[in-house]
Amino acid sequence: MRRITSLVACLGLAATAAVASTTTPAPTAAVEAASAPKAKIGEKAPAFKLKDLNGKEHSLSDFKGKTVVLEWFCPTCPYSGGRGSKSVHNNGSVKELMKNMKGVEDEGEVVYLLIDSSTAKMRVSAEELSKQDAELKKKIGIEAPILIDGDTAIAKAYGAKSTPHMFVIDGEGVLRYHGAFSDRKDSKKNYVLDAVNSIKAGKEVKPNYIRQWGCGVRYQ
């Protein structure tokens, strides 16, 4: 039996040009996501070691041999958080993805991770962000662990630009896909599931990048 663990990453709101920010601007010291270095397809994904809402530490190296899916997440974003029917968590898209991934016959597990890097965006401490995430997790039934990236260092390392911004990493720790959760016009077209299936089949992931959409990300 395979097990799917989940971790969600909430990275603030920097976004594609089509989506406006819905939260208070971050301090002037914050850096816009567009200027950050980016993790590269076909190369090792940046290592991370982050704690979830229960204080448990999770490292990318813990999941060697497993396909890892990262979702950048923000509790106040209408596309990834708890506001409105367009949220991938409110409209059931994430649960549907996780359900479909349970049927992926792979040698290892599929690990779904949520990462929240919204401290600069929301002007809150890591502790306050954890509290808000815990309340929302319970309220809307988020199944995945939420990891707190309090200093936004992991968001910078990955070049996460929006919430949601998805990253799919294979069992060797190589980044195989990043970008949109699904097609903006056809929500049934899920690029993350396509990437996971391709990795399972030993195939090249195509496409390996689709422009992400959602709320924007800001860094400290």
Residue ranges and their predicted role:
Residues 8-17:
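Bacterial N-terminal signal peptides
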Residues 21-47:
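N-proximal helix/coil linker or "cap" segments that precede and/or mark the start of modular domains
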Residues 48-68:
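A short beta-strand-turn-helix
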Residues 168-220:
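Thiol-/selenol-based redox modules, centered on thioredoxin-like
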